[in-house]
Every structure is written in structure tokens, then in C-alpha cells.
């Protein structure tokens, strides 16, 4: 099994993910969490790794705040687009770009990083535990992992609301090989277990798009966006809504020493 490379659909990826209210909402909720993490880590400038960072939307915003950001991605096209976007925003001096898969990034880093962003990648990799172990190895003790993954429970709920009963009964097989539908939707309980077994201390969990995708009237996603964002913000960090999110964002700390877990 190979990990997904988006060279063939980079433009479609950008348009479908970030050119919609679902992308706008995803970034808004994500940055609420990231702002809290940054506040807790203090005023110092951080070394940040965006592993599988794609076009760099989050990495560039981090660089605009003065942090030094390393972005790696398996897709050469995504790296090129990220470089162009960084130039346009005037933050190229705060960024480094590495063309490699997330699980290979350790060989490109000389010193550990303070914060790792690993967003919407875990659902595309064939060996998730290996990737998480690599990320552990390049994060300094006391550093933080920001992990966002595609939620298998959210996928099931979305299909049930749509009335796709046969598809759910068949186990929700992937319909096309080369699409934006993730290869490996993740069970959140399994992901939490992987993190805890590796030694991470989970700090917080947030459901991302806990209501947006389930609206009967799709025009409300756009026409009522501000009200929707307010309600998503109110409920997204409590159950059962966390587990209904289309994505789940987990923040986890690497202890100062593993024996403190």
C-alpha cells in the first residue's frame, strides 16, 4: 500500500477543500485551538513542523506570526504552491520547504521542533503508527502535537443522514481510487489509544464540522455561516458532538520524560 500523493489533483484539492465553507469553518475551529496552544507555549518564537502541510495555509499563517516553519509534503506540486503562497505573503524567510513524506522527515531535521502540525494526513497513510512514531522522534520533550484526522464516525453519520443505507451496510468502501475521499477514515478511539500507548499526553479534543455537513438546507452553510460558526464553537469541544465531527482535532504533549506518563 502506498501513501496518497496529490500531484494529480492539486488544483481540485485546493478548490474543494479551501474554496468552500467547509474549509473556512475547518480553519476557523482549528485556529481557535492553535491560538490556545500558542498562548500556553508562551511568547517565544517556535520551530514548527507542518508535516504533510500541502499548500501551506496553516504553515503560512504560523509564519506570519513570526515562527520558523518547516513544511514537508510528498507532493512536489503542493510544495511549489506553498512556496508561491509564502512569497506572496512575504514570509519566505520564515519558512523551509522539504519534498518528502511525513514519515521520512526525521532524516531532514538536525534538531527537534517545538510544535508539530499534522492535519488531514493520518487518513491517507498506510502505516499510521509508524508516522506518529516518527513525529514523536522529532518533537522536543514538552513539545506539542496538533493532530487532525478524518473521523470514521462522522463519515458513517453523514452517509446515514443522506440515506445511503446500502453503502453503510457494505462497510463504506472507497468508491474511486483517485479522489479526495480519504483512503483510511480513522476510528477516534483507536487514534487516542495509539497516542497514549506511544506516550503522548492528550490535552484536548475538538470536533471539526459537527453540524455543518448535516444541514438539510445546504444553502445555510453559506447564508447562515456566522450563526453556524457560533454554534459549532459552542458545542464542538463536548460530547457527543466531538465524535460526530467530520474531522477531530487532538492536541497532545510529549512529556519531559517518558517515565512521567
Curated annotation (Swiss-Prot):
The keyword DNA-binding does not apply. One of its GO terms (molecular function) is tRNA (5-carboxymethoxyuridine(34)-5-O)-methyltransferase activity. HAMAP family: tRNA_methyltr_CmoM. GO terms for biological process: methylation; tRNA modification. This is tRNA 5-carboxymethoxyuridine methyltransferase. It is an enzyme of class 2 (transferase). The keyword Methyltransferase applies. It catalyses: 5-carboxymethoxyuridine(34) in tRNA + S-adenosyl-L-methionine = 5-methoxycarbonylmethoxyuridine(34) in tRNA + S-adenosyl-L-homocysteine. NCBIfam families: PRK11036.1. S-adenosyl-L-methionine binds at residues 26, 52-53, 73, 102-103, 119. Catalyzes the methylation of 5-carboxymethoxyuridine (cmo5U) to form 5-methoxycarbonylmethoxyuridine (mcmo5U) at position 34 in tRNAs. Keywords: Methyltransferase, S-adenosyl-L-methionine, Transferase, tRNA processing. It comes from the Bacteria. Belongs to the class I-like SAM-binding methyltransferase superfamily. CmoM family. Gene3D superfamilies: Vaccinia Virus protein VP39 (3.40.50.150). Its EC number is 2.1.1.-. It comes from Escherichia coli O157:H7. Homodimer. Pfam families: Methyltransf_31 (PF13847).
